[in-house]
Amino acid sequence: MKKTAILLLVFLCQQANYAQTTKYSTSWFGPNANPVPEFTDARIPSKTTVSLMADYYFGYGDQTKNGYFKIELPLLPERVSLKIWSTVLEHYKTTAEIMQKRGSSSVSGSEGGDIYVQTRIRLLKEQTNLPSIILNSTLKTASAKTFKTRRYFDTPGYYFDLEMGKSIATRGKFISEIRAVANVGFMCWETTNSTQDDAPMYGGKLIIGNPKWKLENTLSGYWGWLHTSTRLNPTADYGDAPLVYATKLTLVMGNIDYFAQYQYGIHDFPYHQLRVGISFPISKLTPKF
């Protein structure tokens, strides 16, 4: 019995020491672990909207392919909605160097992703001299099954953010609308030994187009505090302040939006992303109260 207790104590100490070397950040995990949150054009749809996407991340010793599913249900059309999304069937392949650097257990494999649940509330309707303002409250579940592969965190997280958007009508045929969107918020996630990493979120988006097409350019990121701590980050490489740039082209054909996106990790997000997808409304799934 005494021998068993000693072995158990040694095992727990080893696990604690091992866990403390894990950096819960975008620099040390797969691209879907804790990405920079996306934000919309500061509008809530009138009908339930489904989006289906395929992503390819590459560069810096990690190649990742995955599906992506998103659904937004307007509980009160254009005022309140519930949104759910998740990565689907992630397949990855890394170099041996990246595997060793992250402390991962495998260079390749497949994973299921985290599930996000978000409520969206319109605080202010867009008017001539006022922007629309949307409040988002988001919960990230720890749905992924395997932590040792360093694809997803084994801890939950949450964030709150405000989207503010305003359009200008140009009366042109090729470009009939210019819309500017700003995003500010606060993100929090749990790390080693219940230590919380807190981060202000920020972003800006410029959208141009007409009813048939639109082009979005987005710069966004968040700024975690753990990389600033000399005690918790003595090697100064925690990497929890990602900044990304994305450009997205959408073509509208009937009720279906077809889109393609390229995203570049400027800081603490060592990936390029290519995304293609479709988005469409489903009237029969729209709640009617």
List where the protein language model places each region.
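Outer-membrane beta-barrel "beta-signal"
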Residues: 247-254, 271-289
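Bacterial Sec-dependent N-terminal signal peptides
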Residues: 1-23
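Flexible, glycine/proline-enriched loop segments at strand-loop-helix junctions
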Residues: 147-151
